[in-house]
Amino acid sequence: MVGYDAKADARSNSKLEVAVAGSVSGFVTRALISPLDVIKIRFQLQLERVCPSDPNAKYHGILQAAKQILQEEGPRAFWKGHVPAQILSIGYGAVQFLAFEELTELLYQANLYQTHQFSAHFVCGGLSAGTATLTVHPVDVLRTRLAAQGEPKIYSNLREAIRTMYRTEGPFVFYKGLTPTVIAIFPYAGLQFSCYRSLKRAYDWIMPPDGKQTGNLKNLLCGCGSGVISKTLTYPLDLFKKRLQVRGFEHARSAFGQVRSYRGLLDLAQQVLQHEGTRGFFKGLSPSLMKAALSTGFMFFWYELFCNLFHCIRREDR
């Protein structure tokens, strides 16, 4: 179960088990959804409309983008930036789930958990994700840069990217986009965790277990649903984050169409509205929703699966 449960003390996992389950969950999920993530980032950074009617648009659909990336850059392009992405996912998963379990236990001990469970999961989910974000944000910037570049590559590998970015843009380059990231991640993760719990309860109400072992399917479906809800409600801030993370990297974006510079978050929002319209705030939403559904579904699925696995191993050792 995700979150503290006083009734399941015998099944509680240790802090190490929680961290490992979160890390493995992040690792497996990232490997599976990386192609969608690359397409999503390309859509978010494209200034032209993502539709076939715009002749200047490089990408105008998920299948078309996948085909074009495959033709121009080869199959490995779908895993561009995968090494920093995996470091990001492993570290993020460990910190997020460990912090979430600890925070929900603290709220329970303060007698604030049982009567406000949706709010408790929202706040704890947001705080745990914020903590994880501050920990791994530099890796997220590296991952975005590596995934965003076309051919010829500006950075041939992770080490060169770190060295070049530090030398040409200074140490603060690794925290570009941090403000919209933190602003976006709190409600996004909060909704992930709170909606996941609510959807699981709704699932049990609609389809009572009746002794059947349907937990894994339930975790996957409810995770997918919570991912779609949370991503839809917070998507514009994710787009802002990606645009700001490649600020100062415009020369590598010239092959993808128009290039525009932004002074900050407010200037970015104004320019998107002025030049791209309200639809500009939702560029890349389709692959993002697909990615959010799969990544959140897999995240909770694998996390609960490994927590249960650790419990079974401990029980057999007794």
From Swiss-Prot:
It comes from the Eukaryota. It is a multi-pass membrane protein. PROSITE patterns: SOLCAR (PS50920). Solcar repeats lie at residues 13-106, 116-202, 214-309. GO terms for cellular component: mitochondrial inner membrane; mitochondrion. Mitochondrial transporter mediating uptake of thiamine diphosphate into mitochondria. It is not clear if the antiporter activity is affected by the membrane potential or by the proton electrochemical gradient. This is Mitochondrial thiamine pyrophosphate carrier. GO terms for biological process: thiamine diphosphate biosynthetic process; thiamine pyrophosphate transmembrane transport. Keywords: Antiport, Membrane, Mitochondrion, Repeat, Transmembrane, Transmembrane helix, Transport. PANTHER family: SOLUTE CARRIER FAMILY 25. It catalyses: thiamine phosphate(out) + thiamine diphosphate(in) = thiamine phosphate(in) + thiamine diphosphate(out). Belongs to the mitochondrial carrier (TC 2.A.29) family. InterPro entries: Mit_carrier, Mitochondrial_sb/sol_carrier, Mt_carrier_dom_sf. It is found in: Mitochondrion membrane. One of its GO terms (molecular function) is thiamine transmembrane transporter activity. The chain crosses the membrane at residues 19-39, 87-107, 122-142, 173-193, 220-240, 293-313. Its main location: mitochondrion.
